[in-house]
Amino acid sequence: MGKGDPKKPRGKMSSYAFFVQTCREEHKKKHPDASVNFSEFSKKCSERWKTMSSKEKGKFEDMAKADKLRYEKEMKNYVPPKGETKKKFKDPNAPKRPPSAFFLFCSEFRPKIKGEHPGLSIGDVAKKLGEMWNNTAADDKQPYEKKAAKLKEKYEKDIAAYRAKGKVDAGKKVVAKAEKSKKKKEEEEDEDEDEEDEEDEEEEEEEEEDDDDDE
């Protein structure tokens, strides 16, 4: 199911993801009470997958094809909630949010997992990373947490400066708008004065003509 919308169809799985799922289920049946060493288990699955013949992999490839059809069919009937397609405007110059300790950990280990499990789907890679993080000792997490804290501190300073600059720019726009409005008003007043002067001149000329006629 989708993270934001519970009605969103579940993402399609790869043939390798189905294979790993089967291995996990087999392991649980054989060792229901045993805790799984995720790293070792993943390595064994990867090695086993590499040695399998095309015929053995065929079963999982068929499962992946069927799941792909299921996903495509569900997506055709899926209507996203209103407003989901609309994206908020993001200023490209705004400071980017800092990554979390877990995100930094993922950035480091994601290429390794992809290398060990080339057929793994994005969702399963994320799941593996989550399990690895949960099994990581607090001391081993510290370097990532320290780096994340430093990046957060820098971000807070940058965003404060960015917002302050935004207020200054907004203030400049207001002043510029006011000056423009004032200038326009002055120009209109000057035009009115010119029209009044022209009217006065016309009246004077008419009076002079009347005087000439009287003579």
Swiss-Prot record:
It comes from Gallus gallus (Chicken). GO terms for cellular component: chromosome; cytoplasm; extracellular region; nucleus. PROSITE patterns: HMG_BOX_1, HMG_BOX_2. Residues 178-184 are annotated as: NLS 2. Residues 83-94, 166-179 have a biased composition (Basic and acidic residues). Multifunctional redox sensitive protein with various roles in different cellular compartments. Nuclear functions are attributed to fully reduced HGMB1. Associates with chromatin and binds DNA with a preference to non-canonical DNA structures such as single-stranded DNA, DNA-containing cruciforms or bent structures, supercoiled DNA and ZDNA. Can bent DNA and enhance DNA flexibility by looping thus providing a mechanism to promote activities on various gene promoters. Can restructure the canonical nucleosome. Proposed to be an universal biosensor for nucleic acids. Residues 9-79, 95-163 bind DNA. Residues 211-215 are annotated as: Involved in interaction with histone H3. Residues 187-215 have a biased composition (Acidic residues). SMART domains: HMG (SM00398). The acidic C-terminal domain forms a flexible structure which can reversibly interact intramolecularily with the HMG boxes and modulate binding to DNA and other proteins; may involve Lys-3 and histone H3 'Lys-37' and 'Lys-38'. The lineage of its organism: Eukaryota, Metazoa, Chordata, Craniata, Vertebrata. This is High mobility group protein B1. The keyword DNA damage does not apply. Belongs to the HMGB family.
